Amino acid sequence: MGAVTGNGRAGVLGGGTMLALVAGWSVPLLLGMPAERVAAVLAIASVGVLGLLPRIAMITSGLTRLDDRRSNDEPVSRVSVQAAVDSAHRGLAVAAIAAATSATLAGLILASTPGPWRLVLAALVAGALLLRMRAFPLAAEVVTLVAGALTIAGGLLLCWVRERPGTWWGTAVAALGVCAVALAILAYRPPPHVLARGRQVADRVEALTVMALVPVAVGVFGLNSRLLDTF
């Protein structure tokens, strides 16, 4: 991975993330765990990793160390800063694409299996992917996150058509609505104060979405009904 990225530290972050996610999918499936339960766990893990990656990339690339040196009035060369920034971006790109792909796969599996908890969890994952893209600077990362969210949304719409074939028009209306919202977002250029307010709202919605993943995943495992029966 270091040879592919052209940077050893970036390769550690990207390759380590990919290896951890592959192991997270492979080991439970080989042990016979149901795919939808593995998807529920990996959905939470993948979204969580996406939230941690920007900070981890800065630490592993040495940017935080250089910032500390600069804060202490120690000399920092431009070459070292450029190398650290390049390492952070390369490692972040590979790791983010891997985590987004894992979250997309988890969302598709959840959307393709019956059950309200699974469908809600898939929708939350799609929303989390869209909200997470604000933290990633490169186009490849943003495109992967948006494509993943749209793919999961497509899976949910297909589930709708499969379960209720007589309401196919609802799927068409929902798809047109998504396209209309996307075009409006691309065309509208709000003033700076509206952007700042929008970021605050998005931060709160993202926090609520991520927090909701865990109790909904508990429902996928069927533990909510057991807890209700117990108490």
Each PLM stretch: what is its role?
Residues R9-G166:
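Generic multipass alpha-helical transmembrane bundles of integral membrane proteins
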Residues G51, R55, C179-A187, P215:
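Transmembrane alpha-helical segments of multi-pass membrane transport proteins and ion-pumping complexes
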Residues P192-M211:
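Interfacial loop-to-transmembrane junctions
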Residues M1-G2, T17-M18, W25, V210, ...:
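Transmembrane alpha-helices
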Residues V218-F231:
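Juxtamembrane boundary at the C-terminal end of a transmembrane helix
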Residues M1-N7, G127-L138, I185-L195:
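C-terminal ends of transmembrane helices
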Residues A153-V194:
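C-terminal hydrophobic structural anchor segments
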Residues I44-S46, A174-V181, E206-P215:
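Small-residue-rich transmembrane alpha-helices that serve as helix-helix interface/gating elements
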